[in-house]
A protein has these predicted regions:
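Beta1/beta-strand and adjacent pyrophosphate-binding region of the FAD-binding site
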Residues: 3-17, 38
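FAD/FMN-dependent oxidoreductases across multiple families
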Residues: 243-337
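N-terminal FAD cofactor-binding segment of flavoenzymes
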Residues: 53-95
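Conserved FAD-binding catalytic core of PHBH/FMO-like flavoproteins
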Residues: 69, 162, 169-267, 271-274
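Glycine-rich FAD pyrophosphate-binding loop
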Residues: 26-55
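Generic enzyme active-site microenvironment
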Residues: 39-40, 171, 295, 302
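C-terminal helical "tail/cap" subdomain of flavin- and related membrane-associated enzymes
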Residues: 322-413
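Conserved N-terminal helical subregion
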Residues: 3, 81-182, 189-195, 404
Length: 413
């Protein structure tokens, strides 16, 4: 192709992170007018149906992510459809109790916040972000990436939807990123040998807008409260055991799940289908080359135990949007490696730190019973008794501390 530029930025992947980045960029104005942004997505999500059951794939959005979605123009559609704020969280290891010694509890009131975050379906986030992107004047193409051709002036983007030429291509197409592979960037992948089993269950007792997380010898169990009184579960198990739980009759599944939860909410009854996906840790050693950059799961995948995966992706989107806005204001080429390395330096260290922390916490707290478990309980108990340590953890989880992008610090409204 190697002709005239058709777009300033082409984003490969229109999931929640890619679509949000697209909306942020499309809303930017510069001396030459609005940025020309195209998002390429393989398959568009169906319109959300508030009457339909809650989807199996959900995310725990931090306060910082909420602010990024507000800046992108996507939050009103989410707030108007279905979201589930949670106000408290209890964490405890096997051998302990959820509110006893050796547990860790968080309360939004400790930060004078209305909640710690909210549970939102991934498809709803994606639909809202794509809607905001189109409303901002972005171009949405449905198709698959077929090739990338780089030269000094731009990138030829070959897709099943047509061919484009851009100054910058962003890989936002997830852990199995085709864009990353075509750009020649590597990824270090570690398989945990586990599956994350997801389902929606109805607890016997009210969940009290509280998230519950129990570390077990064979994995972790998270109960995420939903606005209709049900809970979304994420239960990480060794692969063979997870497959058995998928095949269990509902009554047997309920019995085993209730036991794994330590009966904290009484009997947990299955509602609807179950699904599972493999757990892997992924880190890209490099995020950027000339005219190409990675965001979200294409750059990093962390253990889901703290729900930080999509939140890291939204921080990537906000940081890249800020770096590109600065470059645009200064008349710089958005695809220049110097510009993209500024984003990489900003986000890679934080993402690697979070990944290592999630990996370490999971390994340390998932020892079941015994000496290591008792040490874990003492550690959790110490943090729970230290107002300073606890506040630092809450602020970190909510995205309220550290070198966060301006859009993530800006309060809604």
């Amino acid at each position: 192709m190697s002709g005239a530029l058709t777009h300033d930025v082409v984003i490969v992947g229109g999931g929640p992170v890619g679509a949000t980045l697209g909306a942020l960029l499309a809303r930017q104005a510069g001396p030459s007018g609005a940025a020309r942004v195209l998002v390429l997505e393989r398959q568009l999500p169906p319109p959300p149906d508030p009457a339909a059951p809650v989807g199996l794939r959900v995310s725990a959005l931090s306060r910082a992510s909420e602010r990024v979605l507000v800046a992108a123009g996507a939050w009103p559609a989410i707030a108007a459809t279905r979201r589930s704020p949670y106000e408290r969280m209890h964490v405890w290891p096997e051998g302990g109790t959820p509110r006893g010694a050796g547990s860790l509890s968080f309360d939004a009131g400790e930060l004078s916040e209305p909640d710690l975050g909210c549970i939102v379906e991934n498809l709803l986030m994606q639909h809202a972000a794509l809607g905001a992107f189109r409303a901002a004047g972005g171009t949405l193409a449905t198709g698959e990436l077929a090739g990338l051709g780089f030269d000094a002036q731009g990138v030829d983007v070959r897709t099943t939807a047509g061919d484009y030429r851009a100054r910058l291509v962003v890989g936002a197409d997830g852990a199995q990123s085709i864009a990353r592979r075509l750009a020649g960037l590597e990824a270090q992948v570690e398989d945990y040998g586990q599956l994350a089993l997801v389902a929606v269950v109805r607890p016997e007792r009210p969940h009290e807008s509280t998230a519950w997380q129990r570390f077990l010898g064979a994995g972790t169990l998270a109960l995420l409260p939903l606005a209709d009184g049900t809970c979304s579960i994420v239960w990480s198990l060794p692969q063979a055991e997870a497959r058995q739980r998928l095949a269990d009759e509902p009554a047997e599944f309920s019995r085993r799940l209730t036991a794994a939860s330590d009966g904290v909410l009484g009997t947990l009854s299955l509602e609807g289908e179950r699904a599972a996906f493999p757990l892997r840790r992924l880190l890209a050693p490099r995020y950027a080359i000339e005219r190409f950059v990675l965001v979200g799961d294409a750059a990093h995948v962390v253990h889901p135990l703290a729900g930080q995966g999509v939140n890291l992706g939204f921080l990537d989107a906000a940081a890249l949007a800020e770096v590109l806005a600065r470059a645009r204001a200064e008349g710089e080429d958005p695809g220049a490696l110097r510009v993209l390395r500024a984003y990489e330096r900003w986000r890679k260290g934080d993402n690697q730190l979070t990944s290592a922390a999630m990996d370490g916490i999971n390994r340390f707290l998932s020892f079941g019973r015994g000496r290591v478990s008792r040490l874990a309980q003492r550690g959790l108990g110490w943090v729970d008794g230290s107002a300073i340590a606890k506040r630092l953890l809450i602020e970190r989880a909510m995205g309220l501390s550290g070198d966060t992008p301006t859009l993530a610090r800006r309060r809604a409204g």
